[in-house]
């Protein structure tokens, strides 16, 4: 499970930026939190709102860049241990509007849980070269942190969890050492970290191949889950079939004891979008994965979007700690009946054209109090109270809202 992600000098983001899945102490939707006996609770959902060009997509691209940088070499050499749902390699591009930043490295740090341990992985890239890289771990609830490896340029230091005598410390400067170890060795701590990175789903609607592989899995129980989910949102299908010869999907309906088929192309847009989104969402819920989707609301009707969000927040459905991170423009779901205040985030540019993010929980009113959990979030957002400059500086500082 993702706890926290930080990055610096990536596209529209110049300074260190942190997105946090660690739950605050607020009471709303406490039953939906991902809880561990010895660790702080995590959020099952995170949504990012904001104006076009504010940096919503670039935040997701930063996380996707880190994931793909680690996973791509493993995948290309067919050393993956998990079913990888990632479509393309994303390059680390520095901040646009500063000559010094263009020459500086892009930095990433991800803090996550896998198995019984917590890991903190850092990666710094300048051009195509790895400048710095490190991996540290500790047991969940533990206090002692151990180094797995630390890399500065060509110098690599190994921790006690790795048998130093048999490990090659000479690696291509363009390849993450984490990827190198995953490809060439069977080291338990590396395998666990590798599995987390490989489990992350970066949803790309431009390439449906991965969805098709999931949707037409031989696992009949999985196919039934897809049909049940469609039925839950009043899409009355009894099954589906894929014609390999014609490469065409057909939905099936049972009417008076007889099965009728309809070409996917003849379905309504809402049905098409739901069928397109469901495979990776259900896979994430079934296996406890993180799924990252840009503009999820553009793919789904508001009713369907609310349904998808509810799946991740329902502990009876989300039994393995799946998480959903997405961007949205949809105001109908920006409500206290859908999200906690720490699940709602905003991305906007400041006066220096640098993207910044902040959560609804962080915003202070003029009396220095936080936004109330009973507030009409969508209404106040449209009034400009949660928006970009000139409101941003005043709100975070507890200034005047007008």
Q: Which role fits each region the language model picked out?
A:
Residues 1-4, 253, 310-402:
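C-terminal lobe/lid and adjacent interdomain/linker elements of RecA-like ASCE P-loop ATPase modules
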């Amino acid at each position: 499970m993702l706890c926290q992600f930080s990055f610096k000098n990536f596209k529209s983001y110049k300074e260190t930026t942190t997105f946090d899945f660690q739950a605050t102490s607020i009471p709303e939707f406490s039953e939906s939190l991902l809880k561990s006996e010895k660790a702080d609770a995590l959020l099952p959902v995170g949504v990012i709102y904001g104006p076009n060009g504010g940096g919503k997509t670039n935040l997701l691209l930063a996380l996707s860049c880190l994931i793909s940088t680690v996973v791509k070499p493993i995948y290309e050499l067919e050393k993956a241990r998990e079913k990888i749902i990632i479509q393309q390699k994303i390059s680390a591009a520095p901040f646009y509007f500063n000559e010094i930043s263009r020459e500086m490295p892009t930095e990433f740090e991800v803090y996550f849980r896998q198995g019984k341990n917590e890991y903190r992985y850092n990666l710094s890239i300048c051009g195509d070269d790895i400048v710095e890289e490190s991996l540290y771990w500790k047991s969940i609830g533990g206090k002692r942190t151990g180094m797995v490896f630390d890399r500065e340029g060509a110098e690599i230091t190994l921790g006690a969890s790795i048998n130093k005598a048999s490990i090659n410390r000479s690696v291509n400067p363009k390849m993450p050492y984490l990827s190198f170890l995953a490809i060439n060795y069977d080291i338990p701590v590396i395998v666990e970290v590798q599995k987390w990175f490989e489990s992350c789903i970066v949803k790309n609607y431009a390439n449906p191949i991965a969805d098709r592989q999931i949707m037409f899995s031989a696992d009949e129980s999985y196919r039934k889950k897809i049909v049940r989910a469609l039925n839950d949102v009043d899409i009355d299908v009894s099954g589906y079939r894929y014609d390999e010869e014609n490469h065409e999907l057909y939905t099936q309906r049972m009417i008076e004891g007889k099965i009728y088929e309809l070409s996917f192309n003849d379905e309504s847009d809402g049905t098409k979008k739901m069928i397109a989104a469901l495979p990776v969402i259900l896979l994430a819920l079934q296996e406890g994965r993180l799924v990252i989707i840009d503009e999820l609301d553009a793919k789904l009707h508001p009713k369907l979007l609310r349904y998808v969000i509810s799946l991740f927040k329902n502990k009876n459905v989300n039994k393995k700690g799946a998480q959903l991170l997405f961007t949205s423009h949809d105001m109908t779901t920006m409500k206290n009946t859908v999200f906690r205040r720490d699940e709602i985030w905003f991305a906007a540019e400041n006066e220096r054209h640098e993207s910044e993010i902040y959560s609804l929980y962080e915003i202070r009113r003029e009396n220095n109090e936080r936004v109330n959990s009973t507030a009409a979030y969508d209404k106040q957002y449209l009034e400009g109270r949660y928006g970009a400059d000139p409101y941003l500086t005043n709100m975070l500082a507890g200034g005047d809202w007008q």
